[in-house]
Amino acid sequence: MLSSFVKRQAMTPTMVDRDTFVRNLRLSKLLTAQQFRAATEKLRDVDEAREIAKALASWKLLTKFQAKMLLLGRNTGFFLGPYKILDQLGQGGMGRVYKAVHQTMNRVVALKVLAPQVVESERAHELFLREVQAAAQLHHPNIVLAYDANELEGRHFLAMEFVDGPNLERYVKKNGPLPIELACEVIFQAATGLQYAHEKGMVHRDIKPANLLLQQDANSRTVQVKILDFGLARFTQPDWSHASETILSKQNTVMGTPDFLSPEQSKDLHETDIRSDLYSLGCTFHYLLTGQVPFPGGSIVDKLIRHNKEEAVPVDELRPGVPKTVADIVRKLMAKKPTDRFQTPDDLLNVLAPHAAPSMMDWTTTTPSLSSLGRISSENIELPEEVQVDTEPRAQTSTQISDAESILDWVDVNRKQRRRVRRFVLAAVLALGLLGLTVAGVLAWIWLGTAP
């Protein structure tokens, strides 16, 4: 009991005192010299750093995120080139995403700062540039627009369109399954964006609810869907053959999100085409209609096996109000063989159109309140230089597993099965002279006849 208390105390950061906060505010350059003088003069009689932070945030001189960082003693990392960091939006294996503003253009963007290990070599740097150049060709109302990409002081970043709305994973978790007509409309719009990308020779490879953002049309207030994150994209047109190896697609590595991963993508990342995206879209459709993934529970390997071997429970069984025609669309999208699915997003659009209609919906974008400024920890938020604080973790991130021992941690088998898997992994490592194997390698062995 005492040790737990001591541990909690050790994890709780100490906020700075008033004088340190004011000094850090000046060093941060978040305010102009005139703003700094005026603010400190007006707040000269305020003794608590937290009260000063609350006042500056209420006057819109600081964002809540910036105020928290300053209270934790940070005074650098608020700028990346022309961009001022306003907030942290999320994080994943590839890096972190911030809300930022281009100071000259006064344009708010989503700034994706890649983790250093993602672009370690010169070759990786070249591939990064090729990928973002391809992404810059995607100008479509159902795809998040890429504005800028650059490297500053070893930090690679992409500036993208900022969408002021939730992703569908978060929305469904909070509100439950979508109305049937709205779910059809969301999938219709996502398929429209995928068709455009398909015509440009691009396969997304990580379609899932978390990568579909919602925003309201400024005039009609109807829902608009935006596809996010072509970071795992594969280029299929001859003009992009030089980019078929991306910084995010190492040979024999399973990448994507297990709950939404097509059978063929778990076997061979480089042979996927648009039909793989359609399978993932079908899994997403299933989630929007039922509020659950097609194969809930189990380990990552369990999920991948079930995607290959089992049929998901039909959506009209889980939700009896779903029309049979809609359930049949979901079932066809999730066919195990690519040849049994819709062959292009256009094929899907033709049959889905009667069920989709522009819809209105409301949501509230929630942000941390100033009352929480005293209850923050210092683990998962990071500014582009060195700052670390806490944020809400993403429930589902893309998966890449390539270490032989880590596979054994994921495989949910009994002790006897684990020994068989370990012997296979170690034998293969020795035979091939490799340092590790991927989940795909283990699955290939399981698929040959040892799966339960």
Task: Briefly describe each language-model feature range.
Residues A444-P452:
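Juxtamembrane boundary at the C-terminal end of a transmembrane helix
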Residues S4, E48, G73-V313, T339-D340, ...:
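Conserved ATP-binding/catalytic core of the eukaryotic-like protein kinase fold
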Residues N414-V429:
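Short, low-complexity patches enriched in S/T/P/G
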Residues R26, L30-L31, A57-L62, I207, ...:
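Non-catalytic alpha-helical coupling and interface elements of nucleotide-dependent molecular machines
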